[in-house]
């Protein structure tokens, strides 16, 4: 697991939260 993967996943999570 790399930092880039965690950072990218966090961005996607924030995007989903903002959608709702």
Curated annotation (Swiss-Prot):
Source superkingdom: Viruses
Assigned protein family: Belongs to the coronaviruses ns4.9 protein family.
The protein's name: Truncated non-structural protein of 4.9 kDa
């Amino acid at each position: 697991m790399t930092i880039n993967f965690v950072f990218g996943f966090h961005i996607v999570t924030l995007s989903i939260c903002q959608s709702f």
